């Protein structure tokens, strides 16, 4: 076994590209070595803005040997009566690369056939890597790639070196004009000299001596600890921002934090504006005091250790002062504007070519928000919801949001509060964008819930109505995320509001823009949302068959769907679950088949047609159970329904459902239909694996 190292040296790669590229590099190398029958250890990745690297501590020096069998022509065709080889035998031996004398015979169902055993001793790993590694480099995915110097290959940024070692040997190949070697380079400013790497085990330590921290978790830890330490020196704590730590860790090769300050006058601007200005443009960490109040100072992370930190801090302060001055200017100008004037300007802002302006969207969202807030299941304030919806997009044309787009909603709330709007309505202007990401926080108020769902459902219904349906990786209007947002609000807030009623309302509001059949569009939207629900339930650990069985009944009441799935999943923990599922499934299948054949009537069960006591016993048990479960919760109700199994099993043991007497048959089917309807409230048990 030998260690393997591949490092691709390049110009500075964007921070967000590095981790996904390293994951793809490791996966590709792992898969290709496996496919090539080369034993190896797990890949370990290293990366900085100027290099992507992978190390495997152990790689076999040769492919694994394998023996394969090749079946040839029938013996009767390949040999004559005296056992001498004929042309087919000779040709087969040549094809297999063996002598005729080495051929064997194999008994098959079709007779005796020639067989050749082919021994593949395996090639040297070094030679295989010469072909494998260039291909892997060529296929590392990036959001955007580029070409340079009229060369054919593409990469995130121009590649200037490739370090490739197997043990102490250079793996010789050329990629896009760059020939491999054993050299890497240290920090661009602090140690720019070339470094010879003799074996992969030297790599990480050699770079560290040259002021490059190649290991991302180590570099990330240095960023976080350094920022926290500087913040303490400034008398506060860095505002927690794990995403910013990730970004900064991949902007530098050797983190060197430094603290700075800004004028207290800027604190007149809302905290989120200042934090966003520091974060988005400068990648600075904001600092707060022990009471959570923003302090007029920050931490910047340099890529170079400096002799005079104060001089560097002064430079950062000068740059930030310009940014904060811009933010304060926009804040002061925006405060003098009328939000109603901004709403009018939305008529000149395009939402989508077929769906019209943002102003038109806002008008639809107002109606939908009012409808949702008025629903008994939500029991909100329709007037507040309509007012919040009216102003929910107003800040999109404000100076601050145009400059800092991530402040949409945040500034809406701030401007509404300045204008004297009540707290719940003002908060809804920010909350209506929630949840902003998978697992993100939900709106905190009913008004926020109503406007958030209204905005998302308008986008869903509108886009589907004009044929803009997500497919594959294409989802330009983030409809999957918006659908999940609606589902989460309904489910986690316990709003048993009819999903189909919401979709119907949304399509009614957008019908004048639609160019698709609305009935078909309705079905597509509900199916789309049902798929999202199934995916969410699967992520929560529920069984696929249980999810499908519950969704097949209905997904109109989303909180109830979650309860049904949980109840059926709980049923699977019972000792007699398999027998129970078989019984329920048998009943469901009989009723389904009868319905498909048209032999299922809607008649009531007639006890006078009973021929056996088990029929009477089952009806009595069913009638008592139906009354009992009506007041129970989903879990208890399903567990009670499960107690019908002995009576159902006795029924199946003692009678033939499909009796020759048509009236008796229909009566028994009616009895089973009642049973199926009782447990069919929870799931379609015909879909559940027993």
From Swiss-Prot:
The keyword Amino-acid biosynthesis does not apply. It catalyses: tRNA(Gly) + glycine + ATP = glycyl-tRNA(Gly) + AMP + diphosphate. PROSITE patterns: AA_TRNA_LIGASE_II_GLYAB. GO terms for molecular function: arginine-tRNA ligase activity; ATP binding; glycine-tRNA ligase activity. It is found in: Cytoplasm. It is an enzyme of class 6 (ligase). Keywords: Aminoacyl-tRNA synthetase, ATP-binding, Cytoplasm, Ligase, Nucleotide-binding, Protein biosynthesis. SUPFAM superfamilies: HD-domain/PDEase-like. GO terms for cellular component: cytosol. The keyword DNA-binding does not apply. GO terms for biological process: arginyl-tRNA aminoacylation; glycyl-tRNA aminoacylation. Its EC number is 6.1.1.14. Belongs to the class-II aminoacyl-tRNA synthetase family. NCBIfam families: glyS. HAMAP family: Gly_tRNA_synth_beta. PANTHER family: GLYCINE--TRNA LIGASE, CHLOROPLASTIC_MITOCHONDRIAL 2 (PTHR30075:SF2), GLYCYL-TRNA SYNTHETASE (PTHR30075). Tetramer of two alpha and two beta subunits. This is Glycine--tRNA ligase beta subunit. It comes from Desulfatibacillum aliphaticivorans. The gene is glyS.
């Amino acid at each position: 076994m030998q260690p393997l190292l591949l490092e691709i040296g390049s110009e500075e790669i964007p921070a967000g590209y590095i981790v996904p590229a390293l994951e793809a590099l490791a996966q590709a190398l792992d898969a290709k070595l496996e496919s090539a029958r080369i034993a190896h250890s797990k890949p370990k990745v290293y990366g900085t803005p100027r290099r992507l690297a992978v190390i495997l501590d152990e790689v076999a020096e040769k492919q694994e040997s394998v023996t394969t069998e090749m079946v040839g022509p029938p013996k009767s065709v390949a040999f004559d009566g005296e056992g001498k080889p004929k042309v087919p035998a000779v040709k087969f031996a040549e094809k297999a690369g063996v002598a005729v004398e080495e051929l064997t015979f194999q008994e098959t169902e079709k007779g005796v056939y020639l067989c050749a055993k082919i021994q593949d001793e395996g090639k040297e790993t070094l030679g295989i890597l010469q072909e494998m590694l260039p291909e892997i480099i060529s296929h590392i995915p990036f959001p955007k790639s580029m070409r340079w110097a009229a060369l054919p290959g593409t990469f995130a940024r121009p590649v200037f070196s490739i370090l490739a070692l197997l043990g102490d040997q250079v793996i010789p190949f050329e990629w896009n004009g760059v020939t491999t070697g054993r050299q890497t380079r240290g920090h661009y400013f602090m140690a720019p000299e070339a470094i010879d790497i003799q074996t992969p085990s030297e790599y990480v330590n050699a770079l560290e001596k040259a002021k490059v921290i190649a290991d991302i978790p180590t570099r990330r830890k240095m960023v976080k600890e350094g920022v926290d330490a500087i913040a303490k020196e400034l008398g506060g704590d860095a505002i927690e921002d794990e995403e910013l730590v990730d970004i900064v860790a991949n902007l530098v090769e050797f983190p060197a934090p430094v603290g700075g300050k800004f004028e207290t006058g800027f604190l007149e601007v809302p905290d989120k504006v200042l934090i966003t200005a520091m974060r988005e443009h400068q990648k600075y960490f904001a600092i707060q005091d022990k009471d959570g109040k923003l302090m007029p100072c920050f931490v910047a992370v340099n890529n170079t250790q400096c002799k005079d930190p104060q001089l560097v801090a002064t430079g950062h302060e000068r740059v930030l002062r310009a940014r904060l001055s811009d933010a304060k200017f926009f804040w002061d100008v925006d405060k003098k504007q009328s939000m109603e004037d901004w709403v009018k300007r939305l008529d000149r802002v395009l939402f989508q070519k077929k769906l019209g302006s943002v102003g038109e969207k806002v008008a639809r969202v107002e109606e939908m928000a009012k409808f949702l807030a008025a629903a008994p299941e939500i029991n909100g304030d329709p007037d507040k919801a309509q007012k919040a919806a009216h102003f929910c997009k107003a800040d999109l044309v404000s100076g601050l949001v145009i400059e800092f787009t991530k402040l949409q909603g945040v500034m809406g709330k701030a401007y509404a509060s300045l204008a004297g709007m009540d707290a719940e309505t003002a908060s809804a202007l920010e909350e209506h964008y929630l949840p902003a990401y998978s697992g993100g926080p939900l709106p905190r108020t009913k008004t926020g819930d109503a406007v958030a769902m209204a905005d998302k459902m308008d986008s869903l219904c509108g886009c589907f109505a004009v044929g803009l349906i997500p497919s594959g990786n294409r989802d330009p209007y983030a409809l999957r995320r918006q659908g999940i947002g609606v589902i989460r609000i309904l489910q986690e807030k316990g709003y048993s509001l009819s999903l189909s009623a919401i979709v119907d309302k949304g399509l009614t509001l957008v019908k004048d823009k639609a160019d698709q059949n609305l009935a078909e569009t309705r079905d597509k939207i509900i199916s789309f949302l049902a798929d999202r629900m199934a995916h969410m339930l699967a992520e929560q650990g529920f069984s696929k068959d249980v999810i499908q069985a519950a969704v097949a009944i209905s997904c109109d009441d989303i909180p109830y769907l979650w309860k049904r799935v949980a109840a059926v999943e709980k049923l699977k923990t019972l000792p007699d679950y398999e027998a129970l599922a078989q019984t329920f499934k048998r009943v469901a299948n009989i009723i389904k088949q009868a319905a498909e054949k048209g032999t299922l009537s809607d008649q009531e069960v007639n006890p006078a047609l009973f021929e056996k006591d088990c029929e009477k016993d089952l009806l009595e048990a069913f009638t008592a159970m139906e009354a009992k479960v009506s007041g129970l919760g989903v879990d208890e109700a399903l567990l009670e329904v499960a107690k019908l199994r002995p009576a159902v099993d006795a029924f199946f043991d003692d009678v033939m459902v499909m009796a020759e007497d048509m009236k008796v048959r229909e009566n028994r089917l009616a009895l089973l239909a009642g049973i199926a309807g009782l447990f069919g409230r929870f799931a379609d048990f015909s879909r559940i694996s027993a």
